[in-house]
Design a protein with these regions (language model features):
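Bacterial Sec-dependent N-terminal signal peptides
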Residues: 1-29
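Loop and turn regions of beta-sandwich accessory domains that flank beta-strands and are enriched
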Residues: 109-113, 119-121, 248, 253-288, ...
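Short glycine/proline/serine/threonine-rich loop/turn segments at secondary-structure transition edges
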Residues: 135-141, 286, 403-412, 505-512
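Extracellular/luminal regions of secreted and cell-surface proteins that mediate adhesion/ECM remodeling
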Residues: 40, 299-445, 559
Length: 559
């Protein structure tokens, strides 16, 4: 399926003989929809979808290329007996590119599915993840085979090609070390992924290294390499260039609860997330046309069996032209307020909006004028000051806007008006909207009921109830095991946030994973709920929440 959407309209243009009827202008989005809910689930163990896709040949340049991956639980999947796959399975997004009389395979990202037992994955709408794959523009042309997903969940896949000038033109993408599975010992002993020479593209003016690394297996006393943090390093011409640690905090995973040990940190991934990507700008260290030696290394292993663990790795080099804009800032995303599943841990809320901005211009970014608020309402203005070099990003907390009118419109807008005191050169990435999820409405008086768990775990918990002005109205910690607490709460009209923490990041649920090895350590689950004075439940939380719970609510009417 192939169509495009005119900016701010719903005009469909069909593909015929490789050409589009109609001309794309900056801001238009060309949509490819090769896999839908109706596409048959692949057959075979952990089988992937394979699709031949006709990508656009010449209708660029593309300001952005976004891949939208949506998964949902469905009994028609062929992987196992559950609507969603029972275990956490890793898969890649591969694109096969013709190269002389063979093909070269590029990985555009890696993903790990969530534990599927008793999993809610967005219901019929599914759960959405987005990938910015603009850097792969040189290979997303004409006919290509895409290999993606698996048969544990149903997959819906779209590619969005947004017409316009990118931050800098992407000239070439190369595999330094193509995607592969490697034993930790082989990596550390330099048996695989040895030093290699690269000829930098002479006509390029910028270069970037990208590594996607995830640890797997349960070797040695620290269960390497899924559960063990290791240091990874790039060397150039024999000298250390970039060093990073592969480790990911999973305690605030937005997909919860899951039927597995989802809250615990892992080597570069969590169940239900994309594998972390590590990008390093090579430009300051090289000159166009240089021949360089690149070597990837990992910290030495200990003689305890851990070398049998595994890493799944790809390393790529991207070559670019000069920046297309001198003064330019981009709104990458709106974290708060947002209805996106990825940000559900922070929403709903009517506290400070939180956005991500990026310097998309060659000049250092020092000032940004940001207008924001509800659509069709008077906007607030915030003057950000800081220092971001080209391509650097920052999360910005905006002062709380006027939420009056929220009953009539839940569309929130953020717009960059000026960068460094002048008009931004690229208006295409200056405005973004989100949907404001409405918080629950509570009475002025209610009860917070907490039933603690046992095995000395209650002391890990604490809570606060605070207002939009930052004032903490209620707080408590140092709970006793196996005890019921009832806190009478009385608040005036306004917006409030309840925060409940667990220091060990394992929620207040039972430790069910001890059922075979140490059943005496399973313990009991705690309970956490808000009640009216007559006992009616206002809101009840699931005990398997990981690190913390944030819950916003309104006392009084919606503004």
């Amino acid at each position: 399926m192939f169509w495009y959407l005119k900016k701010n309209t719903a005009l469909f243009i069909f593909l015929f003989s490789g050409c589009l009827f109609g001309e794309l202008v900056d801001g238009d989005t060309l949509v490819l929809h090769p896999i839908t809910w109706n596409t048959s689930s692949p057959e075979g163990w952990n089988a992937q979808y394979k699709k031949i896709i006709q990508f656009p040949g010449s209708d660029g340049p593309w300001a952005k290329i976004i891949m939208v991956q949506t998964l949902k639980c469905d009994s028609t999947t062929k992987g196992d007996n559950y609507p969603c796959g029972e275990w956490d399975y890793i898969w890649n997004i591969f694109v096969n590119v013709p190269k002389e009389d063979t093909v070269e395979t590029f990985s555009m990202g890696s993903f790990v599915t969530p534990y599927g037992k008793r999993l809610w994955l967005g219901g019929e709408a599914g759960w959405e993840w987005t990938y910015d794959i603009t850097d792969y523009a040189p290979i997303l042309k004409e006919e290509r085979e895409i290999i993606v997903g698996n048969n544990q969940e149903l997959l819906d896949l779209k590619f969005l090609f947004i017409k316009g000038a990118p931050t800098r033109n992407i000239l070439r993408v190369e595999n330094i070390y193509p995607y592969g599975h490697h034993k930790y010992g082989d990596l550390a002993d330099d048996i695989v992924l040895q030093e290699t020479k690269l000829q930098l593209l002479p006509e390029a003016r910028g270069y970037k290294l990208k590594a996607v690394v995830s640890g797997h297996g349960h070797a040695g006393p620290r269960n390497c390499c899924e559960w063990d943090s290791k240091t990874h390093t790039y060397y150039m011409n024999g000298s250390e260039l970039f060093r990073w640690n592969v480790w990911k905090d999973c305690g605030n995973n937005p997909i919860y609860p899951q039927g597995g040990t989802w809250p615990f940190d892992r080597a570069g991934w969590c169940p239900g997330t994309k594998v972390d990507e590590y990008e390093n700008e090579l430009t300051p260290f090289v000159k166009p046309g240089d021949t360089i030696s690149i070597d990837y290394e990992i910290e030495p292993y200990l003689d305890n069996g851990e070398k049998e663990g595994e890493f799944r790795i790809s390393h790529q080099l991207f070559s670019y032209g000069s920046p297309n804009f001198m003064n330019g800032a981009e709104i990458i995303d709106i974290i708060v307020p947002s209805s996106k599943g990825a940000f559900s841990r922070f929403n709903p809320t009517l506290s400070n909006p939180k956005v991500i901005i990026k310097n998309a211009g060659a000049y250092d970014l020092e000032r940004v004028e940001i207008h924001y608020g509800l659509k069709h309402r008077r906007k607030s203005v915030y003057h950000w000051c800081g220092h971001l070099k080209f391509l650097e990003e920052e999360k910005v907390f905006l002062p709380i806007p006027n939420w009056h009118g929220l009953r009539r419109t839940q569309t929130f807008e953020v717009e960059i008006k000026k960068t460094n005191g002048v008009k931004d050169e690229n208006p295409l990435n200056n405005i973004l909207t989100s949907t404001v999820p409405l918080p629950k409405i509570f009475p002025e008086e209610f009860i917070l009921e907490i039933k603690t768990n046992n095995r000395d775990r209650a002391r890990e918990n604490s809570f606060t109830i605070s207002g939009n002005n930052g004032t903490v109205y209620y707080s408590r910690g140092f709970f006793k095991d196996s005890t019921e607490y009832n806190f009478p709460i009385e608040l005036k009209r306004g917006f409030y946030e309840f925060l409940f923490r667990d220091d060990m990041e394992d929620g207040i649920s039972v430790h069910w994973w001890n059922r075979n090895s140490a059943p005496e350590k399973i313990g009991i689950s705690g309970e956490l709920k808000f009640l009216k004075w007559d006992g009616e439940v206002l809101h009840e939380f699931k005990p398997d929440f990981g690190q913390e719970l944030k819950f916003g609510f309104i006392v009084g009417p919606i503004p």
